Amino acid sequence: MRWGRRDDRDTGKILRNRSRNRFNIYHYVSTVKKVKETERELLRLTQTWKAIRLISYNSVGISINRLTSRLIHKLHELLNGLIS
């Protein structure tokens, strides 16, 4: 039986395939949204990192190590969110 035929025997199959395709499209779109959100977040973190480096070059007394570890932690959270 071909996929596109509409008779009583494979109507259920066609409906199941359409449902699965709809799910796949939804899953793809939500994954793309996650990727775009992650890209935006990474851009923001990169800008934050550049600001931290500028501050450290200007010898302002803040704990660069603490900020760096927070940045790495945030990046780790983002990547875990993207994978799951």
Swiss-Prot record:
InterPro entries membership: C-84-like
Role summary: This protein may be involved in virus assembly.
Name the UniProt record assigns to this protein: Uncharacterized protein C-84
Organism: Sulfolobus spindle-shape virus 1 (SSV1)
